[in-house]
């Protein structure tokens, strides 16, 4: 089974803090003519980040305002390398924000930040 290598969808930079990103960014979405909504949540409000003593950073998603489809996401902070994969799936499968909001995240986990978006 052959697949094409799609470099733009490699979602992680292993750094400190960790960075995860997928899909399109705000600027690119606007350049492409999308009417967008930007939703952002901070790790300062994340219980797992508080427990681990590393509550800096945020998660952000870019949503098409007309269709509700998730166009992109950026996560900077603890757990970003693991959390971003959920967003890669959402972007690749063109999941709508209302569908995404129905996903349950265990408590306390870093991925709970996505429930706040």
Describe every region a protein language model picked out:
Residues 1-7, 68, 109:
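Rossmann-like dinucleotide/flavin-binding elements
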Residues 2-18:
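Flexible, acidic loop-helix segments that line cofactor/substrate-binding pockets
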Residues 14-117:
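Flexible, glycine-rich terminal cap/loop adjacent to redox cofactors
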């Amino acid at each position: 089974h052959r697949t094409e290598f799609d470099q733009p969808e490699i979602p992680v930079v292993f750094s400190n803090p960790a960075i995860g990103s997928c899909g399109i960014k705000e600027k690119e979405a606007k350049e492409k003519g999308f009417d967008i909504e930007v939703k952002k949540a901070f790790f300062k409000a994340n219980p797992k980040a508080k427990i681990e003593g590393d509550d800096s950073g945020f998660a952000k998603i870019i949503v098409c305002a007309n269709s509700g489809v998730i166009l992109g996401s950026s996560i900077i902070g603890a757990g970003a390398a693991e959390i971003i994969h959920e967003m890669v799936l959402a972007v690749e499968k063109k999941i709508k924000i209302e569908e995404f909001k129905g996903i349950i995240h265990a408590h306390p986990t870093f991925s709970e930040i996505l429930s706040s978006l």
